[in-house]
């Protein structure tokens, strides 16, 4: 149990039996009337974002979320199998829970899995990963009608936009949050 004055970004709240992550918060002290806290909350399971206002000092339930480092092993049907690197327990996590992180997951890659009472909530990847381009069209010198980028397929099957000078077989850095090309990998 905490108060709204203790809110921080990334905190997970239990509101009416549902889990919400605090995306943004702002303490507001108007000239007239009581202080309040304006928040932007993201539903952990659905990803829905809502604005919610709390009176300052009101008690809220903080959910205990255990973030554990896990290794991605393989995909089995509609679920991804992760292994806890400390206990060696295996978790079958549905594709819906993994979300967009699936586009950048390679076998044996490490990720942080958030657990609430033993149930996986979401998967966090590092901010950037290095992946190999499996296919891209050759870039033609002087072809600028597309703004200097072209589509490329990664070894995970995901498609991203890369500069014209990138060729098939090259390793590139990709931002896992936006799916954008960051540069060539330092290998």
UniProtKB/Swiss-Prot annotation:
Domain of life: Bacteria
Cellular component terms per the entry's GO annotation: cytoplasm
Subcellular location: Cytoplasm
Listed pathway(s): Protein biosynthesis; polypeptide chain elongation
Protein family according to the UniProt entry: Belongs to the elongation factor P family.
PANTHER family: ELONGATION FACTOR P, ELONGATION FACTOR P (EF-P) FAMILY PROTEIN
Chain's role: Involved in peptide bond synthesis. Stimulates efficient translation and peptide-bond synthesis on native or reconstituted 70S ribosomes in vitro. Probably functions indirectly by altering the affinity of the ribosome for aminoacyl-tRNA, thus increasing their reactivity as acceptors for peptidyl transferase.
Protein name: Elongation factor P
Source species of the chain: Acidothermus cellulolyticus (strain ATCC 43068 / DSM 8971 / 11B)
Gene: efp
